[in-house]
Amino acid sequence: MTDTQNRVAMGYIKGVFGIKGWLKIAANTEYSDSLLDYPEWHLVKDGKTISVTLEAGKVVNSELQVKFEGINDRDLAFSLHGYTIEIPREAFAPTEEDEYYWADLVGMTVVNKDHTVLGKVSNLMETGANDVLMIDGEHGQILIPFVSQYIETVDTGSKTITADWGLDY
């Protein structure tokens, strides 16, 4: 697996703050400040990758702001606007049995108990009660609650989820 394939997109740089190189971050994580747990970030845009080290970070009015080593003025910070933030997968904490990162589920093929392909997981959404798989396929978009009542197996090796879900639901 290449380094690029082993990184997970965790958000993007949406703007700058102040004149000392601080950046505003749109995080694709449950808690935006969880990105501060990772000292090394890869910034990707238009096929270009820049590796940066987190110098400082804070949440201000529910917005994540960060500063990278060597980025000390507004102009240099602005040059990073729009870059996607990627974190190496091996930096993630290990999961418990039957626990998964959303990034690991996206792209998996979902089949039902009759082995009918329902589609691929395109995204997940949080509903408060439980997470819901958003599946795109030839049958349109299907939403399946990610709970044991409907999810029979998750095979990360074959990238397949088996669900107790009919096409007529």
Swiss-Prot record:
PRC barrel domain ranges (all copies): 97-169
Keyword terms of this UniProt record: Chaperone, Cytoplasm, Ribosome biogenesis, rRNA processing
Biological process, per Gene Ontology: ribosomal small subunit biogenesis; rRNA processing
Chief location bin: cytoplasm
Domain of life (superkingdom): Bacteria
UniProt GO molecular function: ribosome binding
Keyword check for rRNA processing: yes
Subcellular location as annotated: Cytoplasm
One GO CC term, this protein: ribosome
Pfam families from the UniProt entry: PRC_RimM, RimM
Cytoplasm in keyword set: yes
Domain notes: The PRC barrel domain binds ribosomal protein uS19.
Role this protein plays: An accessory protein needed during the final step in the assembly of 30S ribosomal subunit, possibly for assembly of the head region. Essential for efficient processing of 16S rRNA. May be needed both before and after RbfA during the maturation of 16S rRNA. It has affinity for free ribosomal 30S subunits but not for 70S ribosomes.
Family, per entry: Belongs to the RimM family.
Quaternary context: Binds ribosomal protein uS19.
PANTHER family: RIBOSOME MATURATION FACTOR RIMM
Protein name: Ribosome maturation factor RimM
Originating species: Neisseria meningitidis serogroup C (strain 053442)
Phylogenetic lineage: Bacteria, Pseudomonadati, Pseudomonadota, Betaproteobacteria, Neisseriales
